Amino acid sequence: RPGMNIAWLAFNTAKPPLDNPEVRHALALAINNQRLMQSIYYGTAETAASMLPRASWAYDNDAKITEYNPQEARARLKALGLENLTLKLWVPTSSQAWNPSPLKTAELIQADMAQIGVKVIIMPVEGRFQEARLMDMNHDLTLSGWATDSNDPDSFFRPLLSCAAIASQTNFAHWCNREFDDVLQKALLSQQLSSRMDAYKEAQRILARELPVLPLASSLRLQAYRYDMKGLVLSPFGNASFAGVSREKTEEVKKP
């Protein structure tokens, strides 16, 4: 089942030309997400349409996966006067819960960008140094992700994309949007679940419009079990509940 995790590509919105949402949307069109699913995850993840995993109660079912259209991407960049663009993509070197092979992912993105005339230079970064290096703001793009043991949508949005998260060094996009922050605060203060859900859906629409980060994948939670076991429930956090588990009766095969 879908897990409470997300892998994404962050644009450094503090650096031109990535401070322009139109540029970010154009670059997003160049990424072949279906190939990422086949070459990186091998069926153990689903393409992400939102920064909020599908397992969340506030997930926007109207969220759309960014289409793959390199011809349109090239045309948009040309219309914006951007040709022969070179970008630095900073990538963690080690496997992560939301991305088993970040470097291979970066190479696939590099190849996709080359198809639209954008040169991507891959900059491998050791995990423990990644946050500090990204806060220097020298990167253009970075691959990252997030997993949480909380089902509260705020645990995804606020630590990663709020204005305050820039100072706490977890907002790798360096994106600060007061409208987005206000919506998060409205959701946090609301006492009604329906109102919170509406606010978080609005937050997802803002992210889809501004695109400071491009959601890539949400890893599935997998559990191996016997063929005759019934009623096993796996939570989005990876925990298994055996409360309703039973074994299906099968005829015993008598040995001769």
State the predicted function of each range:
Residues 78-150, 172, 193, 221:
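Ligand/substrate-recognition segments at binding pockets and active sites
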Residues 184, 188, 193-208:
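Short amphipathic alpha-helical coiled-coil/interface segments
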Residues 1-3, 10-20, 57-71, 133-137, ...:
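Short, solvent-exposed loop/beta-turn-alpha elements that line the ligand-binding surface or hinge
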Residues 18-111, 115, 176, 202, ...:
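Append "and occasionally in soluble cytosolic enzymes with long acidic Gly/Pro-rich linkers
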Residues 4-6, 47, 84, 211:
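Extracytoplasmic
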Residues 9-10, 17, 35-40, 128-163, ...:
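Pocket-flanking alpha-helical
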Residues 43-46, 146-148, 217-223:
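Short, solvent-exposed turn/loop segments enriched in Gly/Ser/Thr/Pro and often Arg
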